[in-house]
Amino acid sequence: MEYFLGDNPFFGVNHRVGSKNLADQGERFDKACSVIIESINHGFSGFMLSSHTEGKALVDKATKHLAERNLQLRLALVIPYPHTINDLVASHGYVGGLKRLLGSTRAGFIYDLTRLLFMSRTALRKSLITSYIQAEKASFENDFVTVDSFCLHNVFTDMFLGLRRFDLIIEFIECCDAIGVTPVIISQNPVLAMSLVTKIPHVVCFSYNTLGYMVNPSLDSVNQAIIENGLESHKKLWAMQILASGNLSLEAVIPYTSDASVST
């Protein structure tokens, strides 16, 4: 059983009552850093974080606390976050933004751009996905922070599942595997997400709790899919919303998720 810290409380996100007014960032991040340090001290496996600018600011601040205590933080980074690419284009233009995604030097950019022109559509997509993942990884990592998992945002996962473009999700899994990070597929349709056909080790992350809150399409069908997934040793399961937005106690939740063979 692994436990991961989630970032929603640090940014005022609550799926039951919606977003709430936030305290000053300095005060909020001080408290968040304390929680992050405590999660490491209590054996949490990592921290799932969205790749937006505030997420980066939180990691930068947490790094100072980590350095003081000589601790290491493992990140599971949720991508894509559109504003990251928007910021690149706004700051550097289309060509400049592409250059920063593909290569840090002029010669490297020319080489990468030339290579893209002669790629197949699938190869082109995978090259861009890989470059984007590598850029995000480099942005968040430092001596005390390692990004060892990349999580495909459920908006994109579920859109691809709905369109039956399973190939796009598998390409994401392949790109992560190629650069040595764990691919995580976040979905609100876990039954379909667990049915993806690939032998590459990956994680399926979904809402799961005893109340059936935000569990789709139903708690019974997800339970059955979890049982069937037990035969797929290369697929791990992570559960979100285990407290059902505060409607369940931690004491009530842990035995249930442990029996279900999912990490939280």
Could you describe each region identified by the protein language model?
Residues 5, 75-77, 185, 239:
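Structural beta-sheet core signal
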Residues 58-78, 181, 235:
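Short acidic, glycine/proline-enriched helix-loop-strand junctions
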Residues 4, 46-48, 151, 205, ...:
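Conserved beta-strand positions in the central sheet of alpha/beta enzyme cores
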Residues 1-68, 253-256:
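N-terminal binding-site loop/beta-alpha segment at the start of enzyme catalytic domains
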Residues 22-36, 52-62, 125-139, 164-172, ...:
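Well-ordered, non-membrane alpha-helical segments in soluble/globular domains
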Residues 12-24, 47, 120-127, 205-215, ...:
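Acidic/glycine-enriched edge-of-secondary-structure segments
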Residues 29-36, 41-46, 50-54, 67-163:
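Active-site beta->alpha loop and helix N-cap motifs at the rims of alpha/beta catalytic domains
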